[in-house]
Amino acid sequence: MLENYGAVASLAAFPFPKPALISQLERGETPWCSVPRGALDGEAPRGISSGYPFLKPAGISHPEQVEEPLNLKLQGEGPSLICPEGVLKRKKEDFILKEEIIEEAQDLMVLSSGPQWCGSQELWFGKTCEEKSRLGRWPGYLNGGRMESSTNDIIEVIVKDEMISVEESSGNTDVNNLLGIHHKILNEQIFYICEECGKCFDQNEDFDQHQKTHNGEKVYGCKECGKAFSFRSHCIAHQRIHSGVKPYECQECAKAFVWKSNLIRHQRIHTGEKPFECKECGKGFSQNTSLTQHQRIHTGEKPYTCKECGKSFTRNPALLRHQRMHTGEKPYECKDCGKGFMWNSDLSQHQRVHTGDKPHECTDCGKSFFCKAHLIRHQRIHTGERPYKCNDCGKAFSQNSVLIKHQRRHARDKPYNCQISHLLEH
């Protein structure tokens, strides 16, 4: 029986008790209430908020006449208003779409004076400031599609089968939203409003799930791996990892991504955009994470420390690669010869031995190399650079391996002093 209360809640503009209304419904009678005499003169009952819809008694002139006026029934000496059967029998599937509500609200705003009229439901919707003095407590007035007031606007809505007042702290309230609430009430839909953010729900389950997000609860779990999320959209996006669906495709190279944010970052490769700039040196980066890692060069911060040897790194991937030296793990294996490597870059260079690919070419002589490090060593022949210097004799070399061989000669020339024989002599 309570579900019918939302349908007749539009009678709230007229003073009648809720228990009496429910009793009428239980007896199978058509709900009705007494119409104040002021309403027959086109006035809303005193003290009723302009933002809340109320039924228009028949016979009152309005800018847009309807074909079938509301039926009035006399009881005793005073007139009584019968709730239209069409409103009572309306179902959820007849709910007016939001776009239609917005268009209807825009049509209402052309009225310059008098009560605002909802033609589809034969309801008045608020009044203008010209009639402010006749309404007693007046929270605001319609102007250009918005509800404006110097005080708090009060909007009456249905929450959990009860009538409450929701105070809008801001000075402006979108009248389209008021019309949307009005239509949902007439279509037997109950609103559940979140007190934290003001978001509305027409399903109690959705309302309860939403409130848990404010408490930090992760109520949406992945059925594949059990990972939980606070928001349903995040859970849906995560499940694409398991399904392999990549709906976001780059129009330049056709590469697809699971997340839209990854596509945006990828597109910066094509555009060359680097929106994240270092304040210390002015260097730009395409990703914010890259900027954060770069800034550690200036600050000297190395938050990732190896537990085996104590060596620290600026990036976590660098620490993971370093730890393979202690564990001996070689996760990257060549499919041609089965040789394993600690780093993917080493595997890529090794595979060029099988493919014969030499992408690094010397600009001076045209000689090509498998890896860039070999090209750099070769170019020192042309430049004459010798960065490796012997500490014993000062001789310099272009390659570190040649320096090591040279230092072994100095080691052979130096006699070994036996500390034990020296002690025996004394």
UniProtKB/Swiss-Prot annotation:
Subcellular location: Nucleus
Keywords annotated in UniProt: DNA-binding, Metal-binding, Nucleus, Repeat, Transcription, Transcription regulation, Zinc, Zinc-finger
Assigned GO CC terms: nucleus
Cross-referenced Pfam families: zf-C2H2 (PF00096)
Zinc finger (C2H2-type): 192-214, 220-242, 248-270, 276-298, 304-326, 332-354, 360-382, 388-410
GO BP of this protein: regulation of transcription by RNA polymerase II
Every KRAB domain range: 1-44
UniProt main location, coarse: nucleus
GO molecular function, one term: RNA polymerase II cis-regulatory region sequence-specific DNA binding
Regions annotated as coiled coil: none
Purpose of the protein: May be involved in transcriptional regulation.
Name the record gives this protein: Zinc finger protein 662
Source species: Homo sapiens (Human)
